[in-house]
């Protein structure tokens, strides 16, 4: 793949100091034969399990400490700020740990956005999403096992639309929140930025985790903050009450729409690589 060139006044054309990686093949049969592929799937499973275990346990703990009827105190526990830190901090830690193995997705919406941008193949995207959902179920299952007396009483960490908010408001909150997250992922992992600033790959988990933190601060009062279909799915499966299931579609449709908008914006508006990705889709279809 030839390097991109750009015009410099008075100097004609010069080679850029970075190279865009080629689009991932739509279906890559060769990667299915590699151990590294399945190792990455396992990493996504374990990372999502740990993510749900720590974060849902934090939510349950906060509700226990703030329940005055059960001996808690008003404004007790970590509060919304602490919950947001738990989600953002765990994403920072887990992305840092798994980025070199699986890319550190830990979220079907992130995987979907990267697939649309041709960063991952279809088989990888599908297996990642399955692994993330299974990991989420197991993670919340551990919370229920260790906090069986409190888990159901305090809502199981399940996402649902808060009273007083319309379905449209909840859906918009999930779309915008996921857009912020996936847009941050694209920006933090941009090969152009990584090539010019050698510290960027090391620091990439920090803005991603901080984006999760900020979105939680904004949307916990509305939906409990999904922006991660696996997180919402795992909690809904284990809690298994009607309210989370009634609202559950919001936590798949919203994040996937937000991820698609972020992928389109980054690839087609901010970068010229979008046309190349679209062309490779057409080439794959004609093979």
From Swiss-Prot:
Keywords on record: Acetylation, Cell membrane, Membrane, Methylation, Phosphoprotein, Repeat, Transmembrane, Transmembrane helix, Transport, Ubl conjugation
Modified residues (Phosphoserine): 280, 283
PTM comment, free text: Ubiquitinated by RMA1, leading to proteasomal degradation.
Keyword Membrane in annotation: yes
Molecular function GO terms recorded: mRNA binding; ubiquitin protein ligase binding; water channel activity
GO CC annotations, alphabetized: plant-type vacuole; plasma membrane; plasmodesma
Residues exposed to the Cytoplasmic side: 2-39, 105-125, 189-201, 271-287
Presence of the UniProt keyword Metal-binding in the record: no
Resulting phenotype, residue 280 to A: Normal subcellular localization
Domains as described in the record: Aquaporins contain two tandem repeats each containing three membrane-spanning domains and a pore-forming loop with the signature motif Asn-Pro-Ala (NPA).
Record family assignment: Belongs to the MIP/aquaporin (TC 1.A.8) family. PIP (TC 1.A.8.11) subfamily.
Name by which UniProt lists this protein: Aquaporin PIP2-1
Species in which this protein is naturally found: Arabidopsis thaliana (Mouse-ear cress)
Gene that specifies this protein: PIP2-1
């Amino acid at each position: 793949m030839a390097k991109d060139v750009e015009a410099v006044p008075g100097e004609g054309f010069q080679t850029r100091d970075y190279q865009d990686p080629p689009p991932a093949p739509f279906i890559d049969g060769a990667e299915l034969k590699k151990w590294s592929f399945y190792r990455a799937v396992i990493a996504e499973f374990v990372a999502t399990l740990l993510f749900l275990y720590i974060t849902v346990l934090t939510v349950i703990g906060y509700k226990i400490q703030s329940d005055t009827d059960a001996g808690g105190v008003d404004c007790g526990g970590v509060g919304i700020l602490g919950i947001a830190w738990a989600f953002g901090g765990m994403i920072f830690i887990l992305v840092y740990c798994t980025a070199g193995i699986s890319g550190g997705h830990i979220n079907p919406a992130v995987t979907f956005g990267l697939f649309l941008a041709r960063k991952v193949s279809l088989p990888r995207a599908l297996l990642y999403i399955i692994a993330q959902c299974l990991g989420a179920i197991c993670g919340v299952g551990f919370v229920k096992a260790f906090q069986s007396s409190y888990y159901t009483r305090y809502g199981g960490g399940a996402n649902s639309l808060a009273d007083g908010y319309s379905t449209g408001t909840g859906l918009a909150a999930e779309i915008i929140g996921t857009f912020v997250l996936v847009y941050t992922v694209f920006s933090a992992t941009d090969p152009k930025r990584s090539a010019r600033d050698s510290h960027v790959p090391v620091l990439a988990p920090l803005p991603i985790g901080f984006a999760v933190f900020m979105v939680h601060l904004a949307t916990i009062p509305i939906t409990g903050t999904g922006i991660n279909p696996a997180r919402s799915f795992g909690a809904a499966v284990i809690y298994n009450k009607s309210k989370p299931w009634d609202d559950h579609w919001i936590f798949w449709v919203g994040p996937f729409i937000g991820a698609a908008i972020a992928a389109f914006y980054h690839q087609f508006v901010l970068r010229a690589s979008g046309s190349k990705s679209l062309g490779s889709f057409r080439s794959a279809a004609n093979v």
